[in-house]
C-alpha cells in the first residue's frame, strides 16, 4: 500500500522542470519540497525528518546530485533516491547508482514513467 500524502523532495535547478514534476506528483497528493541545488537538498533533508522519497537532478550548481546523494545516503541509507538527468548515457546511470541512487529517469521524463517509478518505491517502504 502506498504512503498517503508522501513527502517528496524534488531537487532541480530549472524552475520549469520543477513545475512539471510538481504538477505530475500532485496527482498522488504528494507534499513537495523544492531544493535548487545539492546543498539545499541536504539542508531540507536534515530539517524535514519525514522525507519519503527524493527526485535528484544530477547536474546542478553549488553541489551536484552525486555528492548530495552520497551525503544523504550516509545519514539515511533507506530513503529512496531517484536520479533524473538529461545526460542519458549509460556511464551516468552507473555513476548515479554508485553514488547511492536507487533508480534513474532520463529527461525528458514522461509523467507515466515518473509516477510508476515513484509509486514502486513508495509501495516498497
Kindly give the residue locations of the regions a language model identified.
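Active-site beta3 strand of CheY-like receiver
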Residues: 49-55
Amino acid at each position: 500500500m502506498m504512503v498517503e500524502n508522501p513527502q517528496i523532495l524534488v531537487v532541480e535547478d530549472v524552475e520549469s522542470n520543477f513545475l512539471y514534476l510538481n504538477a505530475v506528483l500532485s496527482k498522488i497528493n504528494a507534499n513537495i519540497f523544492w531544493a535548487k541545488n545539492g546543498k539545499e537538498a541536504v539542508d531540507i533533508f536534515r530539517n524535514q525528518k519525514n522525507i519519503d522519497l527524493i527526485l535528484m537532478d544530477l547536474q546542478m550548481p553549488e553541489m551536484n546530485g552525486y555528492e548530495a546523494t552520497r551525503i544523504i545516503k550516509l545519514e539515511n541509507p533507506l530513503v529512496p533516491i531517484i536520479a533524473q538527468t538529461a545526460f542519458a548515457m549509460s556511464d551516468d546511470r552507473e555513476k548515479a547508482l554508485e553514488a547511492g541512487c536507487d533508480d534513474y529517469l532520463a529527461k525528458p521524463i514522461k509523467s507515466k514513467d515518473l509516477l510508476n517509478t515513484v509509486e514502486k518505491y513508495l509501495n516498497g517502504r
